[in-house]
């Protein structure tokens, strides 16, 4: 009986080690940085292009990436947050209408990711990062003018449960004060 138990434990440990090795082999993908077309030379136009297309690679609904709770569309959450911080700096450097258009475009793209695959965490993670950076009172990047359009759309989004929609509607109203 002891031999059978020892053999069973050995097999379980071996299988566990093989599975751990497979998990260790995966590494996060780099953030898909956007580059302005070379024909755009004006610095303001470059900033506008970048702010509008910043998230295209990450939020492409056709993008295939490994599903992992530590990643957003295959990119580490830390990298996504750093790129979000960089993007918010660019938002402040462009005209307000361009910034709002970019925020709305991001919302449309994360919703498209959610429609394609509800198991994807892109919608949830990007919405959480948006709130953390642009609405948290302790965030040095807090900007209700940029958060307002996003949260207003969250308040009407089919992928948000009714209770949270009401909370988002309240936040959207607070952003307009």
What kind of feature is each model-predicted range?
Residues 2-8:
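Sec-dependent signal peptide recognition
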Residues 14-16:
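C-terminal motif of bacterial Sec signal peptides marking the signal peptidase cleavage site
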Residues 18-177:
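Oxidative protein folding and maturation machinery
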């Amino acid at each position: 009986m002891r031999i059978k138990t020892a053999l069973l434990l050995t097999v379980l440990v071996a299988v566990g080690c093989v599975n751990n090795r497979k998990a260790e082999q995966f590494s996060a993908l780099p953030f898909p940085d956007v580059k302005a077309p070379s024909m755009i030379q004006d610095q303001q136009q470059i900033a506008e292009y970048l702010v509008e297309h910043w998230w295209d690679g990450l939020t492409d609904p056709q993008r295939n990436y490994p599903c992992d709770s530590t990643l957003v569309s295959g990119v580490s959450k830390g990298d996504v947050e750093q790129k979000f911080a960089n993007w918010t700096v660019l938002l402040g450097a462009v005209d307000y209408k361009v910034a709002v258009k970019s925020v709305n475009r991001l919302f449309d793209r994360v919703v498209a990711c959610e429609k394609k695959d509800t198991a994807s965490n892109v919608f949830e993670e990007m919405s959480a990062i948006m709130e953390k950076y642009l609405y948290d009172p302790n965030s040095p990047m807090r900007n209700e003018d940029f958060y307002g359009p996003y949260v207003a759309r969250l308040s009407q989004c089919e992928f948000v449960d009714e209770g949270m929609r009401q909370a988002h509607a309240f936040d959207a109203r607070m952003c307009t004060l």
